[in-house]
């Protein structure tokens, strides 16, 4: 599998916190960005298999939307234990957003990878979730992947943030009451793009939507048999929902594409109340509250980049 490597620009956490504080103020009424110790992510509401997101941080973009649209390429299946080795971090803790492994589940779904990959010393732990459309009523069904299957796969496309899963210093972002047009992730990404320009910065981590509701989507269980050639056609195919807090989100974003046909931002989420999917934006700006923990990635790994590409379905 082809794999290209790129070194991100990595400012200090203090510098990033200052830049993000300033940019988020344009879009949220109350903003507080600081450098803190990473909270214990094995605890509620995260319940990750590791305590933190620190150590040898990297972003991997695997496959891409052109393997899903206009028509699916069903050969594109990836093993996250192998991806960890590909990004030179066996045993990596991986989180992010991707497409569910249809070949084992038997249907298409939104995938929320939360995986401690295998190392010489430890077996892998799969804390991932997947969300699919309930055939009975068109609602959302959110399930723990390990309760259905025992592999470590995903399919078609994935945006992943990987680290050693260690405790350490992180950037904490608190943002309340949205006053501007941008969603939480886009605001952070565009802030970094404006400030750092042609020095690309990659970020990942986790955030909680503590109050409010969000617009989300889930892909249908069946891939489209007729080509989806525009965003309008894609939106007719997707199932859209409004989902309520609290939601645990797994964002991966890059300030500027250094020439690898990247999806600049991608965020999936899960919850304890059976809702999960792909995050678009909050629908309750007056009451929304975000609390996040982020780190810059040292490296980008672009794995199995599609040779033929397009810009459909990147939202």
UniProtKB/Swiss-Prot annotation:
Functional note: Exhibits ester hydrolase activity on the substrate p-nitrophenyl acetate, in vitro. Regulates DNA damage and repair by regulating HIF1A degradation via chaperone-mediated autophagy (CMA).
UniProt enzyme class: hydrolase
Subcellular location, record wording: Nucleus; Cytoplasm
Cofactor: Zn(2+)
GO MF annotation, one: zinc ion binding
Description of how the protein assembles with itself and partners: Monomer.
Gene: C11orf54
GO biological process: DNA damage response; regulation of DNA repair
Protein name: Ester hydrolase C11orf54
